[in-house]
């Protein structure tokens, strides 16, 4: 009885030394013998604080070994944790400088921040169209909101980042967009042309057309047209002459579709951009052969291609052809 009492009572003062105090940064120094250390070896040692959990149980005199070393190790770890938190605090203090720079294409911008991104000035601040990220930048004391433009979801954005020389879409332009789908790219065209421009968005799918109409409800410069782009005369009464045609219809006869709409709506000297998906036209031929064939078809319709650009790495076997529409002058009859 005497021996047991001595064992349990001898180490009672060691608890504050190595265990509990060490979690907060090693204040206890790790030198304590633990809850039950320091007796005559008659009783089992107690817990030595948080650090003791990884140690095994031993025989007589075990209280000292269990309580001593582990509390010290854990205390050291507490100091290391404090170091990490301090480093993070220093990083938070240095605020990141963000800015927006105009792109060489008028109405398009480059966001400089943690990650650079292509952006357009949001025509409807506070509203996203397809879940894109919005960023706010203060310029001259005025807050401006921009929408990031994902090149993996937009052929036009992919062409811009790919280095296309001209897109011919700028503020106040009138644009005919064939194959508008749910309005992802159309919404960015809406941002570019601004409130003084117009984009006529033609889409045949009624399911995508519903989304397009919802986008147009908040953007007054979008006019949705739910019709087949193969029959431009069906919507002739809705659309005036335009400056630019952008086509993303992904159909085997897309060159003919562009030509029909150009003859009906595109002004002389107007421009066109057509996104060509090689597999949709001829899956047996190489992409280069398909692109060359489509260019020849455009030339036969008085659509003069000026530039051709592939869309890798954003799209596979895709190309954008940019050109000008110049119909042959009418011969005077005598």
Swiss-Prot record:
Omega-N-methylarginine sites (modified residues): 15
Entries under SUPFAM superfamilies matching the protein = S-adenosyl-L-methionine-dependent methyltransferases
Which biological processes are named by the entry's GO terms? blastocyst hatching; box C/D sno(s)RNA 3'-end processing; mRNA stabilization; rRNA methylation
Cellular component GO terms, alphabetically? Answer: box C/D methylation guide snoRNP complex; Cajal body; fibrillar center; nucleolus; nucleoplasm; small-subunit processome
State the top-level EC class: transferase
Question: Which intervals carry biased composition (Gly residues)?
Answer: 8-66
Q: Where is this region: Disordered?
A: 1-97
Entry's localization field? Nucleus, Nucleolus
Single GO MF annotation: histone H2AQ104 methyltransferase activity
Keywords noted in UniProt: Methylation, Methyltransferase, Nucleus, Ribonucleoprotein, RNA-binding, rRNA processing, S-adenosyl-L-methionine, Transferase
PROSITE patterns (UniProt xref):
FIBRILLARIN
Keyword Repressor assigned to the entry: answer is no
Chief location: nucleus
Q: What reaction does this catalyse?
A: a ribonucleotide in RNA + S-adenosyl-L-methionine = a 2'-O-methylribonucleotide in RNA + S-adenosyl-L-homocysteine + H(+)
Protein residues bound to S-adenosyl-L-methionine: 184-185, 203-204, 228-229, 248-251
Q: Whom does it interact with, and what assembly results?
A: Component of a box C/D small nucleolar ribonucleoprotein (snoRNP) complex composed of FBLL1, SNU13/NHP2L1, NOP56 and NOP58 and a guide snoRNA which mediates 2'-hydroxyl ribose methylation in RNAs.
Record family assignment: Belongs to the methyltransferase superfamily. Fibrillarin family.
Q: What does this protein do?
A: S-adenosyl-L-methionine-dependent RNA methyltransferase that catalyzes 2'-hydroxyl ribose methylation in RNAs. Functions as part of box C/D small nucleolar ribonucleoprotein (snoRNP) complexes, where guide snoRNAs ensure methylation specificity through base pairing with RNA substrates. Exhibits broad substrate specificity, methylating multiple sites on ribosomal RNAs (rRNAs) and messenger RNAs (mRNAs) depending on the guide snoRNA incorporated in the complex.
The protein's matches in NCBIfam families, at most eight in alphabetical order, are given as: PRK04266.1-2
Provide the protein name: RNA 2'-O-methyltransferase FBLL1
Q: Which organism is it from?
A: Homo sapiens
What gene is behind this protein?
FBLL1
């Amino acid at each position: 009885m005497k021996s047991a009492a001595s064992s349990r009572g001898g180490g009672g003062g060691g608890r504050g030394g190595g265990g509990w105090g060490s979690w907060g940064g090693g204040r206890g120094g790790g030198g304590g013998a633990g809850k039950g250390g320091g007796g005559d070896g008659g009783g089992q040692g107690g817990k030595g604080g948080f650090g003791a959990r990884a140690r095994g149980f031993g025989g007589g005199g075990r209280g000292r070994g269990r309580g001593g070393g582990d509390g010290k190790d854990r205390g050291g770890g507490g100091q290391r944790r404090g170091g990490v938190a301090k480093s993070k605090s220093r990083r938070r203090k240095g605020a990141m400088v963000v800015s927006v720079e105009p792109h060489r294409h008028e109405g398009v911008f480059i966001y400089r921040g943690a990650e650079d991104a292509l952006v357009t000035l949001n025509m409807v601040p506070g509203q996203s169209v397809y879940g894109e990220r919005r960023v706010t930048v203060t310029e001259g004391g005025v807050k401006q909101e921009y929408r990031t433009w994902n090149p993996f979801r937009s052929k036009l954005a992919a062409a811009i980042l790919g280095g296309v020389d001209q897109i011919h879409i700028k503020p106040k332009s009138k644009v005919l967009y064939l194959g508008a789908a749910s309005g992802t790219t159309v919404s960015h065209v809406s941002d570019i042309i601004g409130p003084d421009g117009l984009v006529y968005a033609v889409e045949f799918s009624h399911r995508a057309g519903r989304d397009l109409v919802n986008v147009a409800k908040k953007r007054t410069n979008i006019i949705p047209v739910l019709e087949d782009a193969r029959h431009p005369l069906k919507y002739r009464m809705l659309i005036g002459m335009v400056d630019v045609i952008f086509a993303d219809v992904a159909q085997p006869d897309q060159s003919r579709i562009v030509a029909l709409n150009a003859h009906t709506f595109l002004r002389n000297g107007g421009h066109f951009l057509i996104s060509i998906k090689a597999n949709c036209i001829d899956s047996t031929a190489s992409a280069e052969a398909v692109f060359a064939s489509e260019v020849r078809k455009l030339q036969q319709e008085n659509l003069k291609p000026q530039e051709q650009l592939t869309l890798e790495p954003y799209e596979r076997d895709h190309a954008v052809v940019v050109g000008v529409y110049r119909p042959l002058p009418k011969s005077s009859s005598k």
